[in-house]
Amino acid sequence: MVTCVRCLIAGRVQGVWFRASTKEKAMELGVRGWVRNLPDGRVEALLQGEAEAVEALKKWLWRGPTLAQVVDVQSEMVEIPEIQMFEVR
């Protein structure tokens, strides 16, 4: 079943290769969507794919790349048209 989740990741998540690492992990898991920095220092990600793969990526967001220090990940289900790829915005 295809699911779509919007995530907000807080902590030390900018300037630590978080977006590039998220894209790499998403591609590995077959998840589509996008990831971007927010002006308030958080990172926002939209994840779409098979429920199991999206859940695996959500769990990975709590760790992130080596230099990241994630303190919170908020997520909510959203409904959007199907996405074809994963991109860094």
From Swiss-Prot:
GO terms for molecular function: acylphosphatase activity. This is Acylphosphatase. Belongs to the acylphosphatase family. It catalyses: an acyl phosphate + H2O = a carboxylate + phosphate + H(+). Keywords: Hydrolase. InterPro entries: Acylphosphatase, Acylphosphatase-like_dom, Acylphosphatase-like_dom_sf, Acylphosphatase_CS. Residues 4-89 form the Acylphosphatase-like domain. SUPFAM superfamilies: Acylphosphatase/BLUF domain-like (SSF54975). It holds the Pfam family Acylphosphatase. Its EC number is 3.6.1.7. PANTHER family: ACYLPHOSPHATASE. The active site is at residues 19, 37.
